[in-house]
């Protein structure tokens, strides 16, 4: 390999991304497509998925993105997502699990059972399910990459986002166990742990003028992240540039956890 940029080339790879129609997930999918991968855009709303796929194709100048809607909380929809990806694009080389929810802000002592179950089902169990579905093909070809979006919240206690943080800490355990189980099959599994980015999902954390100013002051870079800043991160984790990295948690939060 004579050119360093070849390490980041994903040409011909099939990447299935969940929670990728807007926000951070979209930026992650954009990065993969820019690097040459064929990308599945997936979230609950079909029209938004189609729009995102079309805009990514316009951006890269060719048809690299397709839309397959899916609610990851339902096992049968995940199975259809995996099967349709395989039938339309081929075996999955890269699985990027980004879908997540947080329907509750407040003390974990007050969270209703329904909200707790929804967080754990979407943020943890769905990742377990889809990995089970994708791994057989990766094992057969002895090659594959899985990335699960966790959070810097997995490393910090929270008085308002406690249950969400618990789910993201569980994702780290899932990543490490999958990495340990499947390393002998040349399957790498890592976690991406972002901080606060300017997305609709995190708007309550950055869109409150007084509170957001205080929060930004706690970040080493003194600002919140822009979704586009995750494009290169997604490519690194999915590419040969990270070929000797597995079972790790890559924190991308502007230095917030470092100074907690």
Enumerate the language-model features and the residues they cover.
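Active-site loop-to-helix junction immediately N-terminal to the catalytic Tyr of the SDR YXXXK motif
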Residues: 111, 157-165, 177
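Active-site helix of classical SDR
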Residues: 131, 167, 175
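Residue(s) in the substrate-gating loop at a strand-loop-helix junction
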Residues: 151
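Alpha-helical segment proximal to the catalytic Tyr-Lys
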Residues: 136, 180-184, 243
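Substrate-binding pocket helix/loop in short-chain dehydrogenase/reductase
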Residues: 106-108, 112-117, 215
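Conserved glycine-rich cofactor-binding loop
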Residues: 14, 19-23
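Short C-terminal tail/terminal secondary-structure segment
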Residues: 2-6, 102-105, 156, 235, ...
């Amino acid at each position: 390999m004579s050119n360093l940029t070849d390490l980041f080339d994903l040409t011909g790879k099939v990447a299935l991304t969940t929670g990728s129609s807007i926000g951070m997930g979209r930026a992650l999918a954009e990065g993969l497509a820019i690097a040459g991968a064929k990308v599945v855009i997936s979230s609950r709303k079909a029209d938004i998925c189609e729009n995102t796929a079309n805009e990514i194709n316009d951006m890269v100048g060719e048809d690299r993105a397709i839309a397959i809607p899916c609610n990851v909380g339902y096992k049968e929809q995940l199975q259809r997502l995996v099967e349709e990806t395989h039938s339309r694009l081929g075996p999955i080389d890269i699985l990027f699990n980004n879908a997540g929810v947080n329907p509750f802000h407040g003390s974990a002592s007050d969270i209703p059972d329904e909200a707790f179950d929804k967080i754990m089902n979407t943020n943890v169990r769905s990742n377990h399910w889809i990995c089970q579905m994708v791994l057989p093909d990766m094992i057969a070809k002895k090659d594959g990459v899985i990335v699960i979006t966790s959070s810097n919240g997995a490393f910090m206690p929270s008085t308002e986002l406690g249950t969400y943080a618990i789910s993201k800490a569980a994702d780290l355990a899932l990543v490490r166990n999958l990495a340990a189980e499947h390393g002998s099959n040349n399957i790498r599994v890592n976690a991406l742990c972002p901080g606060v980015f300017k997305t609709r999902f995190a708007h309550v954390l950055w869109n409150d003028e007084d509170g957001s100013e205080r929060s930004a002051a706690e970040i080493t870079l003194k600002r919140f992240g822009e979704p586009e800043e995750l494009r290169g991160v997604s490519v690194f984790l999915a590419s040969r540039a990270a070929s000797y990295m597995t079972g790790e948690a890559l924190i991308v939060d502007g230095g917030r956890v470092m100074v907690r």
